[in-house]
Amino acid sequence: MNHNIKKINHLIDTLGYEEAFLYLKQIPLDKINSKILEIFLRVCKNICKHQFAFNLLEQLSAKLNNNLIFLYQKALFLKDYGFVLQSIQILNSLRKKNIHPEERKKIYYLIGEILWKSNRFNLALKFYLFFQKQYPNEYQISRNVLICHSNLGNFDGASSQLTILKKINPFDCGEDYRVVTQLKKFTHLSDPYIDEIKSLLAKDLNSNSKSQLLFALGKIYEDLSDYQQSANYYKEANNLKNIEYANFSIQKKIDQFENLKKVFNQKFLQSSKTSNLCKSFFIVGMPRSGTTLLENILSSCEQISPGGELSTYSKYFNTIYQYRFNNSYKNFSENITQKDLEDIGSFYNDEINRMYKSNYIINKLPHNFLYTGFISRSFKNTKIIHCTRDKNDVLLSIYKNFFAGRLLDFVYNTDNLKNYYQFYLDVMAYWAKVLDDNSIFELNYEKLIESPETELQLLFDYLEIKFDKKYLEFYKNSRGIKTLSINQANKKIYKDSKHKWKLFEPYMSELFS
């Protein structure tokens, strides 16, 4: 059996996933153990053989349904492809079995993660609170409870968890302070949070905690209308975070898109569109351009569910690119066909349909602007909404916030941020030039907040859904959100953020020049 595993890994390293898949298919079912299955599922994932993997798991269930490792692997695979309830059912059965406490803890974390990632924040919160009772001194559990309270806009709940976290580990609470301060409007310089944060900053903290505390102070002093002090803290926070992204290159982004553009020649544009019907509304643009506000409004319609920032399309796009075109943009641009895009659309639809039962789903990952043309060719009836906003307000709103993950690697440096913004404008101008006139609906943030009913009527006409004035009362929705806009999610449309950059201009001239 070890020989099999060595041979499979050798095939992957030398000949690629396709050859490894052909070899794996020849192994009899009764010879597939958990180690081989783990590799098999990874291979299937990398060459888009999802249906084969699902069938394989069902065939193995008869033999391995009491095997805890098999059940865990099955739950992980189902989680990755939108089978939320099935995955949780398996994990729930596993946590009740006689297993090692550390394995049970791992399962608890996974169940909470699945609930949270599928936007079931209330359920995730209830589960994490139950989990917390089992492990009261586990730092990450209390942090996850805090995050769920934050997603639901619950300052008191988040604040109480911060108190717990400070007792467990007082020197690693930077993120927790930042999250909690996002939920509160500060009105007095005597607020105890200010002294607490400044006291922590005087200690020997890691750079991540320190930068998050600085972002928190920037927000607090902005609330207090001390824009000079606020700007100083934001600059210090960004300078600290930018050290992690010293290798960022806008030229790499430009070169990448230049290769993508080569696909959209006249012959390709004249080819017939796919037959895939899409129930997603794609909202694209820069971060902090009004995408969350728009999602809140749209999801007030009973037919539309909020999906949040779904990376599903880019996941399948990149899998096809890596597998079929060997990670080569030249190979990709010269050989991609409409069939490849149809496959991406089919894979996307399968996963989205498993996750959501509504007529329409919102996918508001701003980064999808890079794939706008490909999205439009992957489906027959694509609806793409491009959110635009005053450039300087976008730059400021990005610069004064911390972003999780490494996708937004340009945000902590003023030159990188401005260069990326220009790159985004160039990309969207290109799509507007080559795509049909009605492919993209442009929604301007300033127009939306000034004349919401007029702008939304036009948008709903584009979406082919009847507009109702009650959608303007979106702030009455009780759903939670993951993004930085949580403190605005449950408020009416307001105009305070319009031209806010002018308040910071005297202290951040390098950002707006």
Predicted feature locations:
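Conserved phosphate-donor/acceptor-positioning beta-strand/loop module used by diverse small-molecule
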Residues: 375-400
